[in-house]
């Protein structure tokens, strides 16, 4: 779910914190991708003409595999170095939210069964998306494919967006790609949404900057976290009657939830045993690994392994799979492809024509020369 209403609130109070762009603008960037969000989108969106998820000849869902394969190829062709982060065990404080989702999914399934029985195809298509969910088996299948493609996969201790944020904070990745805005609350400097949208939707990618949010709002990180808790997060309930604008104004005036509660009108109902402090602690100190010395590795493409898995085991079209592999090979064969291949190298300033002709080698600037440049 993320943070309720945060994107709309930022559009009002911190408009400069969000900018729109295209996927090619991230060429050369290492992006931490919330795998569960991406796979869920493929299960929901990649469907046949009847609205049902794509399956193999044995009736097993394959939408997540085919979607991940082609989307990853597109990212790599755009010069992006993807890192897929998978969910670990959710925190206990999220149990209430997960139970609500389970109940909603069961209701949606009952409505879907009824729509199918009555032959209401349009309603059935809508409900199929609401009942979509990723299983552990599907997650493992995606991991296997990515490993064959040579793409790094990271298993989170807890929730994926927290680990994505940790990778960004450690300088290993530029941004977190997710639809969950709580990646900002967890400390990711940049969060990109609509990152996995298909080209035919023509939706711009939206990038949010945490430092810009704090600068425009005048909030500290702790105050921003308290705002997100008031808006509504996955870890605790909210104060009934306090909407997004009121929440913003309360934090702006009183600086913390503790002070808000001291001055809050009796017309607002505060949840009993409200665990906002525990939620705050989860945002400030999420259960993540230390990535300071962690090395991300993009391995060699296993061409035969991919064919064995996708064509032999999963029964995908061999010609299409081969074309996909060729696209990956073509990208890797282009040595001088800008930031993708020289991402970790230092760019040298070329010599001028006169310097090159005379065989001059540039000297490193002296301390005095450096000081002179600074003054200019």
UniProtKB/Swiss-Prot annotation:
Residue numbers spanned by region Interaction with PCNA: 336-344
Domain of life: Eukaryota
Cofactor: Mg(2+)
Cofactor remark from the record: Binds 2 magnesium ions per subunit. They probably participate in the reaction catalyzed by the enzyme. May bind an additional third magnesium ion after substrate binding.
A Pfam family per the record: XPG_N
Post-translational modification: Phosphorylated. Phosphorylation upon DNA damage induces relocalization to the nuclear plasma.
Cysteines paired by S-S bonds: none
Cellular-component GO terms for this entry: mitochondrion; nucleolus; nucleoplasm
Binding site for DNA: 47, 71, 159, 232, 234
GO terms, molecular function: 5'-3' exonuclease activity; 5'-flap endonuclease activity; DNA binding; magnesium ion binding
Region named I-domain: 123-254
InterPro entries according to UniProt: 5-3_exonuclease, 5-3_exonuclease_C_sf, Flap_endonuc, HhH2, PIN-like_dom_sf, XPG-I_dom, XPG/Rad2, XPG_CS
Ranges annotated as biased composition (Basic residues): 360-376
Entry's EC annotation: 3.1.-.-
BP-aspect Gene Ontology terms: base-excision repair; DNA replication, removal of RNA primer
Chain sites annotated for binding Mg(2+) 1: 34, 87, 159, 161
Region of interest called Disordered, as start-end residue ranges on this chain: 352-376
Residues engaged in binding Mg(2+) 2: 180, 182, 234
Region of interest called N-domain, as start-end residue ranges on this chain: 1-105
Intracellular or extracellular location(s): Nucleus, Nucleolus; Nucleus, Nucleoplasm; Mitochondrion
Keywords per UniProt: DNA damage, DNA repair, DNA replication, Endonuclease, Exonuclease, Hydrolase, Magnesium, Metal-binding, Mitochondrion, Nuclease, Nucleus, Phosphoprotein
Enzyme class: hydrolase
Family: Belongs to the XPG/RAD2 endonuclease family. FEN1 subfamily.
Summary of the function given for this chain in its UniProt record: Structure-specific nuclease with 5'-flap endonuclease and 5'-3' exonuclease activities involved in DNA replication and repair. During DNA replication, cleaves the 5'-overhanging flap structure that is generated by displacement synthesis when DNA polymerase encounters the 5'-end of a downstream Okazaki fragment. It enters the flap from the 5'-end and then tracks to cleave the flap base, leaving a nick for ligation. Also involved in the long patch base excision repair (LP-BER) pathway, by cleaving within the apurinic/apyrimidinic (AP) site-terminated flap.
Subunit structure: Interacts with PCNA. Three molecules of FEN1 bind to one PCNA trimer with each molecule binding to one PCNA monomer. PCNA stimulates the nuclease activity without altering cleavage specificity.
Name the record gives this protein: Flap endonuclease 1
Species of origin: Entamoeba dispar (strain ATCC PRA-260 / SAW760)
Source organism phylogeny: Eukaryota, Amoebozoa, Evosea, Archamoebae, Mastigamoebida
């Amino acid at each position: 779910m993320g943070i309720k209403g945060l994107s709309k609130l930022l559009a009002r109070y911190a408009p400069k914190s969000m900018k729109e762009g295209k996927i090619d603008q991230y060429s050369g960037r290492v992006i931490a991708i919330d795998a569960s969000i991406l796979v869920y989108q493929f299960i929901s969106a990649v469907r046949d003409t009847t609205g049902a998820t794509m399956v193999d000849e044995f009736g097993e869902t394959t939408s997540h595999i085919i979607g991940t394969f082609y989307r990853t190829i597109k990212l790599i062709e755009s010069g992006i170095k993807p890192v897929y982060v998978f969910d670990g065990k959710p925190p206990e404080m999220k149990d209430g939210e997960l139970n609500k989702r389970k109940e909603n999914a069961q209701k949606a399934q009952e409505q879907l069964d009824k729509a199918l029985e009555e032959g209401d195809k349009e309603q059935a298509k809508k409900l199929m998306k609401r009942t979509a969910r990723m299983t552990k088996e599907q997650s493992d299948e995606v991991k296997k494919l990515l490993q064959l493609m040579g793409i790094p996969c990271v298993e989170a201790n807890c929730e994926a967006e927290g680990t994505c944020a940790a990778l960004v904070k450690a300088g290993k990745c530029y941004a977190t790609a997710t639809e969950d805005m709580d990646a900002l609350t967890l400390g990711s400097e940049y969060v990109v949404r609509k990152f996995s949208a298909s080209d035919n939707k023509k939706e711009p990618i939206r990038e949010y900057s945490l430092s810009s949010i704090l600068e425009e709002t005048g909030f500290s990180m702790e105050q921003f976290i308290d705002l997100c808790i008031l808006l509504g997060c996955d870890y605790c309930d909210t104060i009934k009657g306090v909407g997004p604008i009121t929440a913003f104004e309360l934090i702006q005036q009183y600086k913390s939830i503790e002070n808000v509660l001291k001055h809050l009108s009796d017309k607002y109902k505060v949840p009993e045993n409200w665990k906002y402090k525990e939620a705050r602690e989860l945002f400030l100190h999420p259960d993540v690994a230390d990535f300071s010395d962690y090395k991300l590795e993009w391995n060699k493409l296993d061409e035969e392994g991919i064919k064995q898995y996708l064509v032999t085991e999963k029964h995908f079209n061999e010609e299409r799979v081969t074309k996909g592999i060729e696209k990956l090979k073509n990208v890797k064969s282009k040595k001088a492809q800008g930031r993708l291949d020289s991402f970790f190298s230092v760019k040298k300033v070329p010599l001028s024509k006169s310097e090159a002709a005379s065989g001059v080698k540039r000297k490193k600037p002296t301390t005095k020369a450096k000081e002179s440049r600074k003054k200019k």
